[in-house]
């Protein structure tokens, strides 16, 4: 029994040492922002379930407080509307299209969430990208994979680079994704490489993404169709958004000279109340706007970070594993902990 106990202790010590090695924080990166600003902030708004009625008041509020953020859109109508996250307005709707064009005119960034809510084959993707370009005058700089779309690039088990995580997800994951598979009817990896600059990979619970990934944005050698990946901070719904941007976190973001790109679903309903923006949403924006922050679209911030001294886009193996462990840990916490409770 003593021999077994010693073996268990030894294994635990080895595991602890290995975990400590991968989780040891990388060298911090100091960044100076335009105009003497103390930190950078944006929102990356996922278009799931977004309707003109819900999102227009929210963006009016963002504009009023001086924010320029990133909003994803769908070009084509959903072909799988029975899946709730696939529902929402698209650029096929004239009023919604006019609203999106007005946002772009005001300085907001329009990004892609796949060409539709639902899986698309290559010709539809080509047509959707051309229509995006025709309407907005440019191709999207940012793409965000959507839910169960089979045309997602490097999604599911291929979202991971560390082999044990990839294998583990492959065993439990029920869905496959083919956007990077040149033999698939859903392939468009070459178009991502040609037209899209940034793709979101993982989301974290930390407000300052530079502490998670100092070299953001980054490249991954095993995912060649994506030019650059970037992390986001978890503000999925109003409760998590409110929790992430509480005053003490904003104090820290400002103190550390950090970067926060909040990933959220502004059109899903939680940000609205009585036909307008929820008061808690406005309170967080008001606090943010009172601080010396650089409020710019996500791709503008990422472009700027690439130009700063000390940027190293190619992650080491250790950094890759660290990002994946931290993402897994955040996902576990989100699953185990109750949502924040607010009055």
Please report, for each region that a protein language model flagged, where it lies by residue.
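Surface-exposed cleft-lining segments at the edges of enzyme active sites
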Residues: 225-238, 266-273
């Amino acid at each position: 029994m003593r021999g077994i106990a010693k073996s268990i202790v030894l294994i635990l010590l080895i595991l602890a040492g290995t975990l400590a090695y991968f989780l040891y924080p990388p060298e911090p990166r100091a960044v100076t922002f335009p105009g003497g600003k103390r930190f950078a902030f944006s929102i990356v708004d996922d278009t799931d379930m977004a309707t003109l009625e819900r999102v227009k008041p929210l963006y009016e509020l963002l504009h009023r407080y001086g924010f320029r953020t990133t909003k994803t859109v769908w070009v084509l109508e959903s072909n799988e509307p029975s899946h709730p996250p696939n529902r929402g307005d698209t650029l096929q709707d004239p009023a919604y299209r006019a609203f999106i064009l007005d946002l772009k005119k005001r300085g907001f960034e329009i990004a892609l969430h796949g060409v539709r809510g639902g899986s698309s084959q290559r010709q539809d993707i080509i047509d959707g990208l051309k229509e995006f370009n025709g309407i907005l005058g440019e191709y999207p700089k940012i793409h965000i994979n959507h839910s169960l779309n089979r045309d997602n690039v490097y999604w599911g088990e291929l979202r991971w680079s560390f082999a044990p995580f990839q294998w583990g997800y492959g065993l439990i994951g029920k869905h496959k994704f083919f956007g990077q598979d040149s033999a698939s009817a859903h392939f468009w990896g070459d178009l991502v490489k040609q037209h899209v600059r940034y793709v979101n990979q993982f989301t974290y619970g930390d407000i300052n993404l530079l502490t998670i990934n100092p070299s953001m944005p980054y490249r991954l050698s095993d995912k060649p169709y994506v030019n650059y990946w970037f992390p986001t901070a978890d503000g999925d719904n109003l409760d998590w958004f409110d929790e992430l941007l509480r005053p003490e976190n904003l104090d820290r973001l400002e103190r550390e000279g950090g970067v926060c790109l909040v990933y959220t679903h502004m059109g899903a309903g939680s940000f609205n109340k009585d036909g307008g923006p929820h008061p808690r949403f406005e309170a967080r924006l008001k606090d943010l706007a009172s601080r010396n922050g650089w409020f710019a679209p996500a791709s503008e911030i990422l472009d700027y970070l690439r130009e700063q001294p000390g940027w190293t886009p190619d992650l080491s193996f250790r950094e890759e594993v660290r990002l994946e462990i931290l993402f897994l840990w955040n996902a576990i916490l989100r699953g185990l902990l109750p949502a924040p409770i607010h009055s």
